Amino acid sequence: MKKFKMVIIALVVALLVPSSAFASSMETLGSGEWDYIGYDYFRTQSKNFYSGGGDFMICLDSSSPKGNYYLFEEDPYSRDDKVAGVYFNGGSGDNFYKVGNLPHCHIFRDIGGFVDGTNDRAEFYVSRSTDTGEALVGAYD
């Protein structure tokens, strides 16, 4: 019985401690790499995505409606700041490019001036002027 308990304890410990092969396969994001923030399905305005500054990237799903997409920085006590706009045409003749394995991405460069507030973050959201269907956006910082 004592030997059986030792085998069970050894098995539990082996399962709780990650192997070096598993640990080395985990990706560590560092400076100069894109950190995934999240995604949102939206019709005219996405949820807020928090950015620490530098560059900010959005990626649209190919099923997202064609048209103008705008990046805004939310200001709770004043008018929201329009960062920039970009036209999405489904990947043909627009300003969206493949970044790594992510198709239909646009990078907004040098947006650190929009970082504000007590959380020292910029609160970005993506907006569309017309509701022509549901868009799917992914955000990266």
Predicted regions span which residues?
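Sec-dependent N-terminal signal peptides of Gram-positive bacterial secreted proteins and lipoproteins
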Residues: 1-23
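Post-signal peptide N-terminal regions of Sec-secreted extracellular proteins
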Residues: 24-141
